[in-house]
């Protein structure tokens, strides 16, 4: 035990020790240690998670005869229910693709897809800043991989050219909206690059984009009009869609490969049907939420401008707004100060972000008002 204790002490010395907070949620507010704070750290981008009208409308349609609260098994055994197929068909239809497949979480999706679709003779080329879950999936793939410089497509092209013909298949892996900087990948350029090389597939994680961007809330791929050109388009239900789970839209042949070879899918008890029914209910309504998307973008543009004015740094183009302070100590102190003023802001430190870029990750939601954001800015 002494070795584990020493590890924790080392983390504390570097201001990198983490703990799970005790929280009480009250709509867009958080109660912590008897302090009520506006939640500036949530991924509930459309503000749906505490929408009581939506919740009541969903519950009333069942009249007490609710879907099962557990699947009790993997979908490949006895854990499949009609609502799973209903949701997969709805997602595929909305994206105008052949098929969709559900997963228990975005993490399950990202650690399972690449190992299922690659061989030891494959190559993965991933953006330097992809999420930890994608990195874990790459490591589990046991094939060759390189990380290209963040959003540097000339570097990516050089890696594609250098390795052309050497591997049985190549996967380009990126997020659309990056979770810590809030910047956006150029999906059109990535599609163009992919098409220049044979046996090359594009895998895009839209976790922080689905619901928020695109005319129908289908993400950056919809906004860029490239949905049909992305081989594996992953999204999550646990952020803007106020639910749990994830999906991939892809060709039917890839779906069948995942069903047969993806270990996190095969060996996990499936999501509760009740949860999947709620997801279906929310996903049906995505096209109707344009007012929320427009309001969120107005809030985001204002906050990005104000933070950039103070720090001279603003990589973001989205509702994820990094307030980059640099060192751990300054970031921890500022987060504490903002919490004392009534704003639940959390410090993000290495190894989550590169050394010297510690920041407060500000995350806006559509149920906030412009006055609330202006009052927050006055505290910066």
Swiss-Prot record:
UniProt-listed InterPro entries: Aminotrans_II_pyridoxalP_BS, Aminotransferase_I/II_large, AON_synthase_class-II, AONS_Archaea/Proteobacteria, PyrdxlP-dep_Trfase, PyrdxlP-dep_Trfase_major, PyrdxlP-dep_Trfase_small
Annotated pyridoxal 5'-phosphate binding sites: 106-107, 179, 205-208, 236-239
Segments traversing the membrane: none
Cofactor: pyridoxal 5'-phosphate
Reaction(s) catalysed (UniProt annotation): 6-carboxyhexanoyl-[ACP] + L-alanine + H(+) = (8S)-8-amino-7-oxononanoate + holo-[ACP] + CO2
Modified residues (N6-(pyridoxal phosphate)lysine): 239
Keyword Transferase included in the entry's annotation: yes
Residues the entry annotates as binding substrate: 18, 131, 352
Signal peptide positions on this chain: none
GO MF annotation list: 8-amino-7-oxononanoate synthase activity; pyridoxal phosphate binding
Entry function: Catalyzes the decarboxylative condensation of pimeloyl-[acyl-carrier protein] and L-alanine to produce 8-amino-7-oxononanoate (AON), [acyl-carrier protein], and carbon dioxide.
Quaternary structure and partners: Homodimer.
Name used for this protein in its record: Putative 8-amino-7-oxononanoate synthase
Source species of the chain: Haemophilus influenzae (strain PittEE)
Gene it is expressed from: bioF
